[in-house]
């Protein structure tokens, strides 16, 4: 079995299997042991944990996970990586299940039920940057029982997840993530920690899921419609953003009245509102729609 974690071993494995990186899968393998160890520490993995790894690649981080967790479920979309994982890099571990599937099509709740009795799991991943948001939001919206999600993402995306009102990075993603979890940037990771090197900076972010939502809202679906509409046309006022949104078909007068009841100026932009204010606005509009 090849023990991974530095460029030399990674290259040996790739050459042995004549592996070719596929751009469509956003493959950038981690080759820095310090970063790998930091991810494991940040996720606070113990021998009691079931860990879901998304996109194990050649199994570099999976090896660390197998040595620290009770059980690992690794979901890999690229069929060309499965022989490497099963026959080589993970062959000596008996606590890992490899699933060759698109993570967006996997019933993770069923896995949690079968393998962890429905108790919260931990999610660890070096995520493909082109589908970071769909993966994370998919986990949230499916209400998968999760303790924390510790993932490598594009630096710009990590900044957006952690940003607050009024900052240039604050947006719909910030609010959505913060509704479900408490984000914390663990480390910034330069391109030379990957093979091949990405063209952007990266960051490890830990999302610790809230046991209870930080705000109470009667209509969660409406809340997220309002948030998306407010940032679709970022430079417009909140009122114009909501009035122009195809998702929200409400009379202009109703929107104006709701903003007035919220107690903010009529010219305010969505980027100035907190999560609490969006929740209050959703409740006001929900009441008016009845």
Curated annotation (Swiss-Prot):
Keyword flag Iron: no
Principal localisation: cytoplasm
Gene Ontology terms: cellular component: cytosol
Enzyme class at the top of the EC tree: transferase
Keywords assigned by UniProt, alphabetized: Cytoplasm, Methyltransferase, RNA-binding, rRNA processing, S-adenosyl-L-methionine, Transferase
Catalysed conversion reaction: adenosine(1518)/adenosine(1519) in 16S rRNA + 4 S-adenosyl-L-methionine = N(6)-dimethyladenosine(1518)/N(6)-dimethyladenosine(1519) in 16S rRNA + 4 S-adenosyl-L-homocysteine + 4 H(+)
This enzyme's EC code(s): 2.1.1.182
Compartment list: Cytoplasm
Species, as recorded: Lachnoclostridium phytofermentans (strain ATCC 700394 / DSM 18823 / ISDg) (Clostridium phytofermentans)
Name used for this protein in its record: Ribosomal RNA small subunit methyltransferase A
Pfam families the UniProt entry points to: RrnaAD
Its biological purpose: Specifically dimethylates two adjacent adenosines (A1518 and A1519) in the loop of a conserved hairpin near the 3'-end of 16S rRNA in the 30S particle. May play a critical role in biogenesis of 30S subunits.
Domain of life: Bacteria
Family: Belongs to the class I-like SAM-binding methyltransferase superfamily. rRNA adenine N(6)-methyltransferase family. RsmA subfamily.
Binding-site residues for S-adenosyl-L-methionine, renumbered to this chain: 28, 30, 55, 76, 102, 126
């Amino acid at each position: 079995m090849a023990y991974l974690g530095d460029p030399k071993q990674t290259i040996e494995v790739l050459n042995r299997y004549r592996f070719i990186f596929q751009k469509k899968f956003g493959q950038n393998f981690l080759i820095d042991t310090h970063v790998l160890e930091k991810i494991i520490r940040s996720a606070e993995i113990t021998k009691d944990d079931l860990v879901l790894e998304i996109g194990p690649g050649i199994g570099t981080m999976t090896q660390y996970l197998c040595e620290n967790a009770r059980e690992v479920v690794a979901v890999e979309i690229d069929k060309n990586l499965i022989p490497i994982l099963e026959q080589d890099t993970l062959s000596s571990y008996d606590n890992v299940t490899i699933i060759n599937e698109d993570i967006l099509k996997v019933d993770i709740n069923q896995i949690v039920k079968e393998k962890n009795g429905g108790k919260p799991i931990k999610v660890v991943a070096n995520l493909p940057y082109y589908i970071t948001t769909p993966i994370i939001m998919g986990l949230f919206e499916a209400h998968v029982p999760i303790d924390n999600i510790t993932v490598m993402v594009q630096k710009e995306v990590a900044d957006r997840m952690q940003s607050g009102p009024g900052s240039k990075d604050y947006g719909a993603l910030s609010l959505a993530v913060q509704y479900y979890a408490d984000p914390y940037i663990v480390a910034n990771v330069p391109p030379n920690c990957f093979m091949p090197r990405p063209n952007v900076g990266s960051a490890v972010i830990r999302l610790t899921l809230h046991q209870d939502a930080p705000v109470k809202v009667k209509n969660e679906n409406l809340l997220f419609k309002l948030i998306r509409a407010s940032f679709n046309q970022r430079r417009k006022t909140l009122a114009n953003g909501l009035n122009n949104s195809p998702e929200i078909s409400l009379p202009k007068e109703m929107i104006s009245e709701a903003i007035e009841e919220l107690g903010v100026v009529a010219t305010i932009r969505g980027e100035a509102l907190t999560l609490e204010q969006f929740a209050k606005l959703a409740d006001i509009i929900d009441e008016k729609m009845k």
